[in-house]
Amino acid sequence: MDRVPFCCLLFIGLLNPLLSLPVTDTGERTLQLPVLEEDALRALEELERMALLQTLRQTMGTEAGESPGEAGPSTETPTPRGSMRKAFAGQNSNTVLSRLLARTRKQHKQHGAAPECFWKYCI
């Protein structure tokens, strides 16, 4: 009998902080950013996307055996950090994508004149 009031007091003591929190109806209000911040976020996302694409093109151009100076027509593009980066124009996006996918493939080592090979396992 002694434990029932103690459990009730403990329960009320633990429940009190939860009841003191304000309850807001989130269904009525939505978070609305000011127009200026929204435009700034869009511009930043566009700059990041452009910088990533240009970096990808640079990487694919140098992997193809070209040095960055020989790559052909280039333009100055801004990066999200505000610096200017040379980017190569005129490359086909399918070429860039195929080079990227080819780079991620696993390169299998060619064994020399292995005398005993069964399927893909060589001794």
UniProtKB/Swiss-Prot annotation:
CC per GO annotation = extracellular space
Location in the cell reads: Secreted
Record bears the keyword Disulfide bond: yes
Leader sequence residues: 1-20
- What is known about the tissue distribution of this protein? Brain specific. Predominantly expressed in motoneurons of the brainstem and spinal cord.
Q: Which Pfam families match?
A: Urotensin_II
Q: Which GO terms describe its molecular function?
A: hormone activity
The protein's name in its UniProt record: Urotensin-2
Organism from which the protein derives: Mus musculus
